[in-house]
Structures are given as C-alpha cells and as structure tokens.
Amino acid sequence: SSPLKHVPLSERDENDPEQKLGTVLDVILSEFDKLGYKTVYGVLDAVNYGVPQFRERFVLIGSRDDEDVFLPIPTHFQMHQDKKYQWQTVRSVIEDLEFDHGECATLSEERLKFLKMVPEGGNWRDLPKDIIPIAMGGAYKSGGGKVGFYRRLSYDQPSPTVVTSPVQKATMMCHPTQNRPLSVKEYARIQQFPDDWVFTGTTAAKYRQIGNAVPVGLAEAIGKTVLSVADNTAIVQTKRFRGTNVHNKIRNAIELGGSLYAVK
C-alpha cells in the first residue's frame, strides 16, 4: 500500500529517506481504533465467491458495537470434489449468447485482422512471429507481460478482470471464438447482473458502468457477512473446504481463536 507522504521524484534528492510503505493503511486503522471500531481487512478475489471472473478487491469491514467482525468465507475453489463449489467459467454465463449478444463495441479493421489469428484463450504471443512486431507496434519493445493485447477469453476458465472498455489495445476483452469484443450483455453476465438490468447512456458508458461495478456475488458475500455480524448469527464453517488445501488453514485458525472468515 501507499506511503503516507508522497514526494515526487523531481523533488527528491539522494538524502531523502524512502517513505515507509503501508503507512496510509496504518493511519486509517489507527483512526478507526480511536473511534472504537474493531476492523478486519484483506484482498478478496471475486472468483472465490462464485463470480466467473478473477477480480481482486481490498475489503475493510469494521464495527464499533464490540462485535467480532469477519471477512466472508470463500465458497468456490479451482479444484473441489463437489462441482457446485468449483470456479465458475466464462462458458457457464455467456455461451447461450453466441448469436444473441446484443449491443457491442467494434474493433478497427487493423486490430480485427490480427485478432482473427488468435486462438481461444490466446493473445498477441500466439500470432505468427513475423506478424507480432507489426501488430504490437511500439508496445512490442516495452516492458511488462502485455497479456491484454489481442486477448481472447477462454470458455473453460474464469474471465480476467472486466475493465471499463473491452477494446483498449492493452486490455482487450474479446470473445472466445467470435471475432469481436465482448458485448455489453456478456460484460454484464460476467459481473452477474440480471438480464433485465438497465444500463443507460452510450455503448461506451454502459461498458464503463459495468466495468466499475463490484460483482454481484462478491457484494452479496460481503453483505451477508455484515448482516450476520449485526444480528449475531455469524458462525465459522469449514465443511465446504474439505477437499481443498484451505481446509487445514481455516481449521488451525479456528483452533487459535482467530479466524477471519464467517458465514450466516
């Protein structure tokens, strides 16, 4: 996390000490403590709560009624003996929209030409070697993994994090098999909005609204946990963890009296 004080590089000299990382969070937690709040925080990935998407978000929950507070217990896993507890995939939410996808952004003819060469689940690295420098332009020699360039989703994996536009060159979100970006409706499905949810404005504005949202499954998990603390029905459960490598960690945390997870 960020240092409390930021000194621009242009204003630093060799004698300036490095600012301690994490001091912003330390101050926030200290202020909550002064106000009498118990807090718990962590980074939650929506894919672990039934959302067909990898989407990490920092979550902080607090209470000042002398209640123990918890983060929501994960409900889904990459591998689990029970399929209903396995990660949800792109296929599970958009396959039926292949020929009824609705409103959709468009790619330029230049980008579309290169996308047609990329297989399902692939990206720019799957282009012919002699084509890559042309397709990537100046980004070809830049740093970073550049995984979003000419990216097609995989039907049988969770989606990457939905961003505010599927057609930005560095963060493309393209259909697994069709030569187009994900549609507005497909975007909404991955974020778990119901089909009758109304988004307003231009096509770009609709993508932005969806991309900025908290996925329904993650929001629901947080809401239920807060409610269970408020009405004093929070209990720690481990049954659903059986068959996963998380089970022992949760069991040990309970034995130590300090589990961060709860469900209603």
Task: Name these PLM-found stretches.
Residues S10-E14, S30-Y41, Q53, R57-K264:
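S-adenosyl-L-methionine-dependent DNA methyltransferase catalytic core
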Residues S1, G42-Y49:
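Acidic carboxylate-rich catalytic motifs and surrounding loops in phosphoryl-/glycosyl-chemistry enzymes
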Residues S1-D33:
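A mobile, often basic/glycine-rich helix-loop segment
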